[in-house]
């Protein structure tokens, strides 16, 4: 499956922004769902967002998915909208201001998702990064409660990259002493620097507990 702006396949999601809000109507009946990109829209209140979604979904199949997309620095607002509007999930752009890596953004996303009980409600979390993921990125995403990554295709062959990722993930799982991805959690993650530990609440490497400001949470 792919996230596209035009000409979707039946398994693809359409990314809907200000530029293709009208033209997307031509493909709504031939896709797996839509992702309304709030980062690519003018400021909207809840009622305006709901009105746009109603106008779009009336032309879609009943089983099609409806998701919202926004920046990682607005993740709490994004998750609230998903719950209040009873949508299928969210796409979070992990390329935060300052060009931070997904590794530091994902724990924050996981904390917000847990606070809203999104996983227990059966809603989907998709994390978007701006480069092909490494095995470490994939494991961090799963541990943070976000099992789906959206990323550009690798520069090398896709099949070769998937084989390499499978091998690398298995190696990491063996090193962690885990036999299934479902057993991976935040407890397996470590922050490599103080800033990441203070923002995310992860244990700082070499310090076997969260920083003092997180011990009460």
Features from the language model and the residues they span:
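Alpha/beta enzyme core
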Residues: 3-130, 134-155, 204-206
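N-terminal capping/small domains of soluble enzymes
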Residues: 1-36, 168, 172, 179-217
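Hydrophobic alpha-helical packing residues
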Residues: 56, 109, 165-172
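Generic recognition of stable, solvent-exposed alpha-helical segments in well-folded globular domains
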Residues: 104, 136, 160-168, 179
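A short, terminal or domain-edge coil/loop segment
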Residues: 113, 139-142, 147, 170, ...
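Short beta-alpha connecting loops at secondary-structure transitions
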Residues: 153-159, 172
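Short acidic (Asp/Glu) and glycine-rich catalytic loops that position anionic groups and cofactors
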Residues: 88-92, 165-166, 177
């Amino acid at each position: 499956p792919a996230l596209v702006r035009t000409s979707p396949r039946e398994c693809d999601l359409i990314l809907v922004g200000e530029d293709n809000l009208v033209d997307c109507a031509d493909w709504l009946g031939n896709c797996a769902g839509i992702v309304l990109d709030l980062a690519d829209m003018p400021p909207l209140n809840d009622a305006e967002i709901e009105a746009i979604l109603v106008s779009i979904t009336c032309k879609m199949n009943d089983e099609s998915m409806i998701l919202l997309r926004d920046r990682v620095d607005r993740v709490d607002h994004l998750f609230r909208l998903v719950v209040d509007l009873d949508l299928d999930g969210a796409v979070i752009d992990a390329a935060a201001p300052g060009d931070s890596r997904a590794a530091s953004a994902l724990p924050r996303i996981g904390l917000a998702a847990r606070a809203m009980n999104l996983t227990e409600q059966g809603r989907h979390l998709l994390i978007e990064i701006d480069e092909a993921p490494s095995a470490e990125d994939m494991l961090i995403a799963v541990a943070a409660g976000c099992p789906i990554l959206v990323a550009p295709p690798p520069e090398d062959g896709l099949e070769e990259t998937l084989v390499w990722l499978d091998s690398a993930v298995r190696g990491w799982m063996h090193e962690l002493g885990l036999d299934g991805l479902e057993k991976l959690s935040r407890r397996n993650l470590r922050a490599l620097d103080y800033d990441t530990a203070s923002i995310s609440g992860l244990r700082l490497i070499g310090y076997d507990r969260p920083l003092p400001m997180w011990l009460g949470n």
